[in-house]
Amino acid sequence: MRLLQLLFRASPATLLLVLCLQLGANKAQDNTRKIIIKDFDIPKSVRPNEEVTATLAVQTELKECMVVKTYLISSVPLEGGFNYKYTACLCNENPKTFYWDFYTNRTVRIAAVVDVIRELGICPDDAAVIPIKNNRFYTIETLEVE
């Protein structure tokens, strides 16, 4: 009963302050870090059998490091460096950029894939985390052949 009397005596300014603090706390909880941030860059169009360079820049907002494996997948088989797979230690303060050079003579859809994996000997002292929710990230682009 005494608590209710105190509540009704509280000034509107105090009640507004408590409400704002509650809303601010909820908003701060929604501010989550991104596991993987990727930027996949390939030309929109090329001539037949012209060399293509694909670039994938990867970074994280997590405080912990992760072991990542990056590779490309295409809608049609491609030759050359297209089939290279890279494994690296990805940390917040050390983003990575990966490159692939290949040739194609027809239009192709290409997916750049980043898998967070468990592998020893990649990160210093083998200190790396694996996200529980997602461990595969990808983006798809189309390369037109004129």
From Swiss-Prot:
Main location: secreted
Residues annotated as glycosylated: 105
Signal peptide: 1-28
GO CC, alphabetical: extracellular space
In-chain residues carrying the UniProt-annotated modification Pyrrolidone carboxylic acid: 29
GO MF, one annotated term: aspartic-type endopeptidase activity
InterPro entries the UniProt entry points to: Ig-like_fold, Ig_E-set, PIP
Keywords of this entry: Disulfide bond, Glycoprotein, Pyrrolidone carboxylic acid, Secreted, Signal
Compartments reported by the entry: Secreted
Biological-process GO terms, alphabetical: proteolysis; regulation of immune system process
Oligomer status and interactors: Monomer. Interacts with AZGP1.
Family: Belongs to the PIP family.
PANTHER family registered for this protein in UniProt: PROLACTIN-INDUCIBLE PROTEIN (PTHR15096:SF5), PROLACTIN-INDUCIBLE PROTEIN/SEMINAL VESICLE ANTIGEN (PTHR15096)
Protein name as catalogued: Prolactin-inducible protein homolog
Upper lineage: Eukaryota, Metazoa, Chordata, Craniata, Vertebrata
Gene (UniProt): PIP
